[in-house]
């Protein structure tokens, strides 16, 4: 593959929205034969094994649910756009989702890896949403 092809590939990857990028990572991990849960899960497991029987260290949580808790009224449009970027919702569905009362899962049943959850949380908070991770 030439450097021009690689540059084009990098540009296309950088243009992906967050959800598409996550799907790409999962497909690459699957293609390369990484264990379920990805490379970070195997690195974490190796780190835990190296601690030995010296103590029962609490396992760090690796999967998170992104909870949408609300938004700043003056940032409604930006929040709707951010929700659309982070989900596969259309404009009307994203608007309805944002306008619902109470705390709810961003994508019902979806568990994010820590880095991805933090990225989604930051994107939504930058837009004006109140978000928590569970």
Curated annotation (Swiss-Prot):
Record Gene3D superfamilies: 3.30.1390.10, Single helix bin
Gene Ontology MF terms in the entry: mRNA binding; structural constituent of ribosome
One GO-annotated biological process of the protein: translation
GO cellular component annotations of the record: ribonucleoprotein complex; ribosome
UniProt keyword annotation of Magnesium present: no
Keywords associated with the record: Ribonucleoprotein, Ribosomal protein
Disulfide bonds: none
Disulfide bond listed as a keyword: no
InterPro entries noted in UniProt: Ribosomal_bL12, Ribosomal_bL12_C, Ribosomal_bL12_C/ClpS-like, Ribosomal_bL12_oligo_N_sf
Assembly description: Homodimer. Part of the ribosomal stalk of the 50S ribosomal subunit. Forms a multimeric L10(L12)X complex, where L10 forms an elongated spine to which 2 to 4 L12 dimers bind in a sequential fashion. Binds GTP-bound translation factors.
PANTHER family: 39S RIBOSOMAL PROTEIN L12 (PTHR45987), LARGE RIBOSOMAL SUBUNIT PROTEIN BL12M (PTHR45987:SF4)
UniProt similarity note: Belongs to the bacterial ribosomal protein bL12 family.
Protein name: Large ribosomal subunit protein bL12
Native source species: Anaplasma phagocytophilum (strain HZ)
Phylogenetic classification of the source organism: Bacteria, Pseudomonadati, Pseudomonadota, Alphaproteobacteria, Rickettsiales
Gene: rplL
């Amino acid at each position: 593959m030439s450097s021009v092809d690689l540059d084009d590939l990098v540009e296309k990857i950088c243009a992906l929205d967050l959800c598409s990028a996550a799907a790409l990572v999962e497909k690459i991990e699957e293609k390369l034969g990484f264990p379920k849960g990805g490379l970070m899960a195997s690195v974490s497991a190796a780190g835990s094994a190296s601690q030995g029987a010296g103590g029962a260290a609490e396992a760090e949580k690796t999967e998170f649910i992104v909870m949408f808790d609300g938004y700043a009224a003056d940032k409604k449009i930006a929040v709707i756009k951010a929700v659309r970027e982070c989900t596969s919702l259309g404009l009307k569905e994203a608007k309805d989702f944002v306008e619902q009362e109470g705390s709810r899962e961003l994508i019902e049943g979806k568990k994010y890896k820590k880095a991805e959850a933090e990225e989604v949380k930051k994107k939504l908070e930058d837009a004006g949403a109140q978000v928590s991770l569970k």
